[in-house]
Amino acid sequence: MGLRVVFMGTPEFAVPSLRRIAAMKPQFETVLVVTGCDKPRRSKNSPPEPTPVKQAALELGLPVLEADDVSSHEFALQVAAARPDVIVVAAFRVLPPEVLELPPLGTFNLHGSLLPAYRGAAPVNWAIINGDAETGVTTFFLQKSVDTGNIITMDRTPIGPDENAFELLKRLSEIGAGTVERTLTMIADGAVMPEKQDERFATKAPKLNRENTRIDWNQPVQRLHDFIRGLALKPAAWTTFGGKSLKIYKAKACAIETAPDEPGTLRIADGRLLVAGTDGWIELLSVQAEGKKAMDGELFARGLRARKEMLRFL
């Protein structure tokens, strides 16, 4: 039997890595998959559903542990019973030292940025929001302080000029599977040369919330475009219109010669829904009004044509 691997993860981002590890037999044996508990995922009233990682693990015939409280001693005992040589983590929770120190070959994490850049919960989103041209994935040994452990290896990739967070996250999950495979091979071969993170280049990627996903229209069009695509499709950038929230999923810079009005002002031109930034206009391509289904910008614009007053997003 090869090295015993315990895998921990929950969302779709972690699934390609789990599948890659499962395919690495006999060099590596996935002895346990730890994930979140079944819960309603479509809406509060929908029936409980398994996590994407649990679904994949069951398809692969792997043993699953649904973890509720990862800080409990009982959880540490359950993981210890699997006798892991190494623990692989991808988009899971913060683990206590009691768990991190169980495997003799260490516990490592797959992170969706080029560390030490974008430490935190939303690295993919903030890389796009900030207009970065490049990002990547990093594997590093976990320690008590979040996202600060020694780097094992990383892979880089360009960010497309119109690529959104949903698309980039999916792409990074596939790239990351290869990074995890290489990391495990390096560990098995004793070829890891851990590198300390340079604190001079450390930046944060804070958790997304209602406040930091609201659009400030008093910005250049390119910044607005990056902000909107950096939050698509979830949780989505939003603004206020007519006293209600409006989610914006997709937009693009609009090349028209007319000078922009006050930032946030709406204009309908040839059926297109335009909004003023500080240096031009941005066209809204996909929106969702509060309590309604998503629709394209042109359809939303049709409902505004009869209104004669100046319309603005706040």
UniProtKB/Swiss-Prot annotation:
<dbReference type="InterPro" id="IPR005794">
    <property type="entry name" value="Fmt"/>
</dbReference>
<keyword id="KW-0808">Transferase</keyword>
<dbReference type="GO" id="GO:0005829">
    <property type="term" value="C:cytosol"/>
</dbReference>
<protein>
    <recommendedName>
        <fullName>Methionyl-tRNA formyltransferase</fullName>
        <ecNumber>2.1.2.9</ecNumber>
    </recommendedName>
</protein>
<dbReference type="InterPro" id="IPR036477">
    <property type="entry name" value="Formyl_transf_N_sf"/>
</dbReference>
<dbReference type="InterPro" id="IPR041711">
    <property type="entry name" value="Met-tRNA-FMT_N"/>
</dbReference>
<comment type="similarity">
    <text>Belongs to the Fmt family.</text>
</comment>
<feature type="binding site">
    <location>
        <begin position="113"/>
        <end position="116"/>
    </location>
    <ligand>
        <name>(6S)-5,6,7,8-tetrahydrofolate</name>
    </ligand>
</feature>
<dbReference type="InterPro" id="IPR011034">
    <property type="entry name" value="Formyl_transferase-like_C_sf"/>
</dbReference>
<dbReference type="GO" id="GO:0004479">
    <property type="term" value="F:methionyl-tRNA formyltransferase activity"/>
</dbReference>
<dbReference type="InterPro" id="IPR002376">
    <property type="entry name" value="Formyl_transf_N"/>
</dbReference>
<keyword id="KW-0648">Protein biosynthesis</keyword>
<dbReference type="InterPro" id="IPR005793">
    <property type="entry name" value="Formyl_trans_C"/>
</dbReference>
<dbReference type="Pfam" id="PF02911">
    <property type="entry name" value="Formyl_trans_C"/>
</dbReference>
<dbReference type="InterPro" id="IPR044135">
    <property type="entry name" value="Met-tRNA-FMT_C"/>
</dbReference>
<dbReference type="Pfam" id="PF00551">
    <property type="entry name" value="Formyl_trans_N"/>
</dbReference>
<comment type="function">
    <text>Attaches a formyl group to the free amino group of methionyl-tRNA(fMet). The formyl group appears to play a dual role in the initiator identity of N-formylmethionyl-tRNA by promoting its recognition by IF2 and preventing the misappropriation of this tRNA by the elongation apparatus.</text>
</comment>
